[in-house]
A protein has these predicted regions:
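A generic "binding-loop/recognition-motif" signal
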Residues: 11, 193, 266-267, 407
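His/Glu-based metal-binding/catalytic segments typifying zinc-dependent metallopeptidases
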Residues: 27-29, 213-269, 406
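Short, Gly/Pro- and small/polar-rich lid/capping loops
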Residues: 1-11
Length: 420
């Protein structure tokens, strides 16, 4: 059973009670992420996520960690481009203690200067680790160039330069302006009683006031770009893509189906053609990167430098085949069944249900029933897939980044000419 209550100050409480579960996953969400940062602020939202675990007026950083470990729970957080979440997974009997701990972290952190300086080094190590992980780093590179000049282009972690300039004043200013009642909600799934949680949240979060202030957001423009980023690696990594759909676009169901058929599993076109038939990659997949008002449809592959041209040629050929002929009837049916099956399997976890509650609240402001999603998937036609493929992979609005030791290989925008 899903329930929602809005406190008098505007903080929202969402729960999904799962009586069969003994565990609960609970998150304190704030609708703030790297998208809402100005250039010099890049990385400040993620930095706050780190610092909130470094001590409150009541607890040291060690005591925060010990309190959840003592009951066998998990305490963590993550920052996205449009939201940040502080969450825990515990037994249902420990939920009251956990929400009190999360509230203490969220509302009473002290931002000690020595902890800020220490955590800065941790964040810088996180940036270095990401840059040393090419199959992650290439996605940041693609964003940076495809959406250049827009906040969505910037990495969530920030850069070495911006992180080194973040100080206590910046952190507190962002908290003051954006961690406000109208941007905060609590989501919980599993062994949770809605009325009990509302009472606890009224006591703990009822004092938050005000409305979060943000500069107006606009959708980014796509930039036709083909970039070879030199880095000494054993493999070459490719990321290419074009304009996609937003989280709320009516065509999102067609995008789900196309993505699944093209590169969303072992039976997908790209996996079968590039890996299984040719053995040219270990990893290849397509993906959707979607936000409030925009998105892109991307493809990633990692291969040996001498096989880059072949992998790219086969990938573009498969896209072109869908644009020209659509999906086979069996492919279309299989993609729909795969999507619906994956959706139902995901419902077995309190983590995924809590995240689903939260994302529906952020993007739709309401619960999206599984039946509604299933109907949307089932209603997708081949014509919709063809139109979407042609729109997403328009050669005039595409980008590609290659990462690796690719000396002497220079590709121009005409690389996409195979798409027509």
């Amino acid at each position: 059973m899903i329930q929602k209550t809005v406190l008098t100050n505007g903080v929202r409480i969402l729960t999904e009670s799962m009586p069969q579960m003994v565990s609960s996953t609970i998150g304190v969400w704030v609708e703030n992420g790297s998208r809402y940062e100005e250039g010099p602020e890049n990385g400040v939202s993620h930095f706050i996520e780190h610092v909130l675990f470094k001590g409150t007026k009541k607890r040291t950083a060690a005591q925060i960690a010990e309190q959840v470990d003592a009951v066998g729970g998990v305490l963590n957080a993550f920052t996205g481009k449009e939201y940040t979440c502080y969450y825990a997974k515990v037994l249902g009997e420990d939920l009251k203690m956990t929400i009190e701990l999360l509230a203490d972290i969220f509302l009473e952190s002290v931002f000690a200067p020595d902890e800020i300086d220490r955590e800065r080094q941790v964040v810088l190590q996180e940036i270095s680790q990401a840059e040393d992980t090419p199959d992650d780093f290439i996605h940041d590179l693609f964003n940076l160039h495809f959406w250049q000049g827009h906040p969505l282009a910037l990495p969530i972690f920030g850069s070495v330069e911006t992180v080194n300039h973040i100080d206590r004043t910046m952190l507190l200013a962002l908290m003051e302006h954006r961690y406000r009642a109208n941007r905060v909600f609590i989501a919980a799934a599993g062994a949770v009683d809605h009325a009990d949680l509302v009472r606890d949240c009224e006591r703990l979060f009822g004092g938050i006031t005000g409305n979060g202030s943000y500069a107006p957001v606009t959708a980014p423009d796509e930039h036709l770009v083909v970039l070879n980023h030199a880095k000494k690696l054993e493999q070459a990594h490719l990321c290419l893509g074009g304009r996609g759909v937003s989280q709320v676009d009516p065509l999102r169901y067609a995008a789900y189906v196309f993505n699944t058929a093209l590169g969303g599993g072992m039976s997908s076109r790209l996996f079968q053609e590039v890996r299984e038939k040719r053995g040219r990659v270990y990893s290849i997949y397509s993906f959707l990167s979607a936000f409030l008002d925009c998105g892109y449809f991307g493809i990633y592959a990692g291969t040996s430098p001498e096989w880059v041209d072949e992998v790219l040629e086969v990938t573009l050929k498969e896209i072109h085949e869908v644009i020209r002929h659509g999906l086979k009837a069996a492919e279309l049916a299989r993609a729909k069944s795969q999507l619906k099956g994956n959706m139902l399997l995901g419902m077995e976890s309190t983590d995924s249900r809590m995240n689903r509650l939260a994302r529906n609240e952020i993007y739709f402001g309401r619960e999206i029933p599984l039946e509604e999603i299933a109907r949307g998937i089932e209603a997708v036609t081949n014509d919709q897939v063809v139109d979407l493929a042609a729109s997403c992979f328009n050669p005039q609005r595409m980008g590609m980044v290659m990462l690796g030791d690719l000396k002497g290989r220079e590709l121009g925008a005409d690389v996409f000419s195979a798409l027509g």
